Amino acid sequence: MKNILITGANGQLGNEMRLLAEVNKEYTYFFTDVAELDICDEQAVMNFVTDHQIDIIVNCA
């Protein structure tokens, strides 16, 4: 099973991705926004990707 990171999860596109994730159980989704993960902080992103074994990143920010 692939792990997918969705950034900007509280925006319009991020919310639509949440709806799609609810019906697609083929993947494991991680939803974040700037409060949980600042995508401008490269080290924080790399740590998150490593810690959660992320396969795909979708930037909705």
Give, region by region, the residue ranges found by the protein language model.
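N-terminal Rossmann NAD(P)H-binding glycine-rich loop of SDR-like oxidoreductase domains
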Residues: 2-24
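Short, glycine- and charge-enriched coil/turn segments that flank and shape catalytic ligand pockets
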Residues: 24-28, 43
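Generic anion/oxyanion-binding catalytic loop in active/binding sites
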Residues: 2, 34, 46
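A short beta-strand-loop structural module common to alpha/beta enzyme folds
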Residues: 28-39
